[in-house]
Design a protein with these regions (language model features):
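Extended, charged/polar low-complexity intrinsically disordered regions
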Residues: 1-19
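Short, functional N-terminal and low-complexity linear motifs
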Residues: 1-3, 28-30, 89-96
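N-terminal pre-Walker A segment at the start of P-loop NTPase domains
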Residues: 13-39, 85-88
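P-loop NTPase motor core
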Residues: 17-20, 46-51, 58-188
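Short coil/loop residues immediately preceding or within conserved phosphate-binding loops
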Residues: 43
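Conserved P-loop NTPase "ATPase switch" module shared by AAA+ and STAND
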Residues: 192
Length: 192
């Protein structure tokens, strides 16, 4: 099977998890990843490498869901995944590592770099996908929106734009430069 990182309905995720086989070797890689990911190290980066068809995307998707922990038909992903640990050498240790993920909330961004424009480099591509995952634009407008989010001003901005533009919502205005730029200027003059 080819793993599509964009398929994320509950049924599709459940089916992919049911088909995932956690070998001792994969469990060791999972443990190494969780050790680094849950450490105090800042800006942990991970690079998955392997031959074509070796299961990198599948493993990455399972990691993403373990971190994000979505509910699948009323049961958390981590709870469903825990059945994969039964019988492994380090079952209890890995279970504790997975449980430690609950200490924080994460924003997981899964994307296939082969299907995304990477003409401006991997950092730009990853940032664009991050912005899209937050429901923001994947351009300079998205950077402004993200700045407003970080400063707890985004909701005020949305209300102000709607008020200043005869009830038109920002999500509709931002699609067109002819409407987004004037709306941005008016609102930013008030907010900043």
């Amino acid at each position: 099977n080819v793993i599509d990182l964009n398929l994320q309905s509950e049924d599709e995720v459940k089916e992919e998890l049911d088909g995932f086989i956690l070998t001792e070797s994969l469990a060791a890689h999972l443990s190494d990843f969780l050790d680094k990911f849950t450490s105090d190290m800042k800006e942990t980066g991970v690079w998955l490498s392997g031959f074509y068809g070796s299961g990198k995307s599948y493993f990455a998707k399972m990691l993403g869901f373990l971190i994000e922990n979505p509910s699948i038909q009323g049961t958390s992903f981590r709870e469903r995944f825990s059945h994969k640990l039964v019988g492994l050498k380090n079952e209890d240790f890995i279970r504790n590592q997975i449980d430690s993920l609950a200490k924080s909330k994460y924003q997981v961004v899964l994307f296939d770099s082969a299907k995304v424009d990477c003409g401006r480099g991997i950092a730009h591509m990853a940032m664009n996908q991050f912005l899209l995952s937050l429901g923001l634009m994947a351009n300079w407008i998205g950077f402004l929106e993200y700045h407003l989010l970080l400063n707890d001003q985004y909701e005020d901005f949305l209300k102000l734009v709607e008020k200043q533009n005869n009830g038109k919502q920002w999500k509709n205005l931002r699609r067109n430069m002819m409407t987004s730029v004037p709306a941005l200027k008016k609102a930013m003059n008030v907010i900043m």
